[in-house]
């Protein structure tokens, strides 16, 4: 969301807004930046070995691949693509998390719903909740597939801001829902010393009615929202999961009213947090985190917060998962334009979901081109990531590859 829009949303309070109200605000803003017409009529010729960006991608059943905000893993000789099963109308989750399979990353078979919503009233994943950004990883120790995703409880808008866990013995499911929770309740970031903790405890988020001032930002950087949510746990919205070279897994999420990123270490079974975490870019308004590691260097690509509307991507780099993280210019470059002539400084009309690495000779930036009027018809964008002479990621538009 833009600064003005997000300010209005936050001042009202997530708990006071319905999902429809919040999504309507985002849709109104998005409509001023990009035209969302009816469903695209062109389809990508991916069945003959080409992926065409900015067009519908059909599975072998002839239907558009309805898997958004997710990721791809390889198990055996098969790739599995997980993502949000989005409705054609509305914004809540009515089905669950989709899964597709492929031998070549071109021809995709619809394997159905890997994790279904519950029909039980009061369940955390009751039909009508919001399930977003699902990420599935394989745990070599437990020999199970673990799914983490952003969960909002039914009827509570975006107030819950939880991370949820599920697991399965099979890559296509069914996944068993385990629980949902806030992140790292009652725990300080591991690198936050006693003095900084005392400073954070002197802040008062409820006292700030005037957002976005210099004084307010200073309070945010002191840890105002970290302290506000300290007892109940930190918020978790857009998220990803990263497994490092040593097998350690990390949860990276947009927290503190989408103002700050958190990176948290997961337990060996990937089903809980160890309690070790820290913050990235406090007050920076980053979401949709995507991460990769190249030659010992970590690269984190995020978007800004503009609802469904595209914006300029942000990039951070570090030599350790724990930082310090340095912000660099957006990796998206070039004069070519993407979907509906969106330029590089609008991420070619898309928002990142995952970086698929170790499959092709180059990492692939996976993204969604959102269509909030028909979310099920949101398009997929895959772009190869190059590296310049200094070893910095560079992403250019390509029509197909």
Label the predicted regions.
Residues 2, 17, 23-26:
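Position-driven detector of the extreme protein N-terminus
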Residues 6, 17, 62-63:
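Exposed boundary/loop context
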Residues 2-10:
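Bacterial N-terminal signal peptides that target proteins for export
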Residues 24-401:
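Carbohydrate-active catalytic/glycan-binding domains of CAZyme proteins
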Residues 9-20:
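Bacterial N-terminal signal peptides
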């Amino acid at each position: 969301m833009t600064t003005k829009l997000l300010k209005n949303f936050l001042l009202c309070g997530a708990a006071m807004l319905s999902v429809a109200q919040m999504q309507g605000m985002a849709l109104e803003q998005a409509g001023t930046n990009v035209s969302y017409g009816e469903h695209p009529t062109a389809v990508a010729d991916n069945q003959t070995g080409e992926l065409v960006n900015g067009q519908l991608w059909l599975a072998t059943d002839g239907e558009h691949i309805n898997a958004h905000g997710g990721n791809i893993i390889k198990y055996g000789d098969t790739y599995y693509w997980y993502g949000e099963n989005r409705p054609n109308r509305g914004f809540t989750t009515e089905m669950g998390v989709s899964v597709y399979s492929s031998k070549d990353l071109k021809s995709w078979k619809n394997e159905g719903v890997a994790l279904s919503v519950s029909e039980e009233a009061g369940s955390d994943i009751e039909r009508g909740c919001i399930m977003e950004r699902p990420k599935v990883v394989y745990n070599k120790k437990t020999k199970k597939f673990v799914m983490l995703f952003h969960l909002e409880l039914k009827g509570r808008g975006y107030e819950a801001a939880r991370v949820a866990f599920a697991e399965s013995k099979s890559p296509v499911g069914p996944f068993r829902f385990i629980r949902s929770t806030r992140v790292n309740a009652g725990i300080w970031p591991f690198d936050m010393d006693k003095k900084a903790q005392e400073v954070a405890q002197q802040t008062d988020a409820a006292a700030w009615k005037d957002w976005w001032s210099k004084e307010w930002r200073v309070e945010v950087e002191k840890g105002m929202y970290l302290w506000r949510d300290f007892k109940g746990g930190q918020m978790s919205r857009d998220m990803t999961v990263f497994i490092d070279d040593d097998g350690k897994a990390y949860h990276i999420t947009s927290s503190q009213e989408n103002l700050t990123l958190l990176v948290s270490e997961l337990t060996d079974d990937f089903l809980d947090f160890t309690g070790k975490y820290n913050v990235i870019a406090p007050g920076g308004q980053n979401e949709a985190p995507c991460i990769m590691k190249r030659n010992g260097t970590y690269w984190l690509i995020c978007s800004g917060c503009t609802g469904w509307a595209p914006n300029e991507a942000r990039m951070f780099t570090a030599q350790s998962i724990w930082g310090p993280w340095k912000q660099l210019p957006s990796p998206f470059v070039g004069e070519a334009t993407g979907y509906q002539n969106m330029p590089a400084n609008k991420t070619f009309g898309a928002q990142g979901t995952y970086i698929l690495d170790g499959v092709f000779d180059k990492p692939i930036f996976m993204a969604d081109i959102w269509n909030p009027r028909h979310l099920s018809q949101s398009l997929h964008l895959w772009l190869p990531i190059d590296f310049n002479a200094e070893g910095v990621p560079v992403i250019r538009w390509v029509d197909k590859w």
